[in-house]
Structures are given as structure tokens and as C-alpha cells.
From Swiss-Prot:
One of its GO terms (biological process) is mitotic sister chromatid segregation. Residues 19-30 have a biased composition (Low complexity). The keyword Protein biosynthesis does not apply. The keyword Nucleus applies. Residues 11-30 are annotated as: Disordered. This is Kinetochore-associated protein NSL1 homolog. It comes from Mus musculus.
Amino acid sequence: MAAVSETVLVSAPQDHDAQAASDPQATAADSPLEDFRVRCTLKRAVMEVMEMCGRFVQELGAVLPEDVRELALRDAQWTFESAVQENVSFNGQAWEEAKEHGLMDSDIKVLEDEFDELIVDVATKRRQYPRRILESVIKTLKAQHASLKQYHPVVHPLDLKCDPDPASRVEDLKCRGEAIAKEMSEAMKALPVLIEQGEGFSQVLKMRPVIQLQRINQEVFSSLYRKADFKPDTCVTHVETTPAETGARKASNIVLKRKKAPDCAQRKRYPLRLQRINLDM
């Protein structure tokens, strides 16, 4: 009886342990699975941490042999990044589902504050900068005027070299001076003649035209005023001539004058020219 009772006492705790072990499984089946991943808010910050840790992974390759270093580093880097991506969540989302540029409310608030400050700064500069620009422009113009007043053109001095033999130059100057003096004396001698010629020319210009010159002018330009109905027979006059029977006479300067014809309008328009008859024939 005692042995039986002992087995019961020993077995009883075993049944209790088995029941206690089966209870967590039942509760786990009844409740949803717990998320053991690290909760993060910004994917960008996690990527920066991964990049920083990747440098340490690259430094570990210094102790590896060269033939397997590149492959081992690539495998270690891929394993590290895969492990981080699988064990990180962003607001309950996996690595692939989360956005890289996710912003929190605090970040948005900070950005809004910075944007407001920029707006205020720009508005202030719009009021102040035109005045400052105008002042700087005025100062610049004044400085330019002052610099222009101080500007003086540079004059380079000429090097005057003395002729080692000035006698030849002096002789040349003497010859030229004599030639110029001779020309001036000749000009002064010819000056009275030129003055006399000029006075005569001025007297000729002041003279009035003679009647004979007027008649010549009329004869020259008479063809411009000649009419078609003009009959020259009406104005022709007889001229005295010597008869043919007369013998040879001595040369004389006697000029036979024409008889004056009665005045007519045609004679006034077209006067006859005076003709001289040579009697030395």
C-alpha cells in the first residue's frame, strides 16, 4: 500500500507539469502572434545606421586572405543587411512596405516652423535690401567718380640724343635759310606787279558794258528769238561799192558806210553787223 501511495504522489506532480506545459500552447493558439521585431519610425535613420555599421564589416576583411576576402565581405554584408531588414518594422510595416521618406508629426511641425521663419526673413529683406542696394550703388558711383578724377594719363619722356657732328646740320640749316630768304625777296619784288594787275582787274570789273558789246551780244543770241515769218528782203539796204571799171587804187583804210535804213521792229530785234570792205584787191 505504501508503494502504491508513493507512485501516486510522484505521478501527481508529473500530471500537473504536463497540464502546465499544455496551457501556454493553448493560450498562444487563442491569442495572436507577438511581433518581436524592433519598432522604428524612420527608415532613413535605419539606413544611415546600416551604412555606418557596414564600414565595420568592411574593416573585418583585413584579417581574411585575399583570395576569399571579396566573396566573404560580400556575403557578410548581405547577411547583415538581410538580418536588419527582417528584424525591423516601421509602424507595423515590413521593410519593403515602409517608405524611405516617412515623416513624423514632430518633423512636420519643425519644417512648418522653419518655413514660417523663412517667409518672415524674406519679407524683411524685401523691405530692407532695396535701400541697402541703393546706398551701395551710390557709394560705388561716388568711388568711380573719385577714381576718374585721380586718373592722369601717363606721359613717357622721350630720350633726346645729341648729334655727335652738329656741323653738318648747321650747314644744312644755313643753306635752307638762304634759299628761303631768296624766295622771300623774289616774292616781295613780284608783289607790286601783282598788286598793279589786281587793281587793273578790279577796274575792268567795275567798267560798264559798251554799246558795241551790247550789239555783239544781241547778234550772238539773235538766233534764239528769230521767227519763221521773218523776210530778210524787207530790211536789206544797198551798200555803195566801187565800179569794176576802175583801175587799181592804192591801199587805203577807207570804209564805206551803209545807208541808214528806216527803223523797223525787225531791225531793232536783229541789228545788222558792220562789215569792212577791203579795197586792196
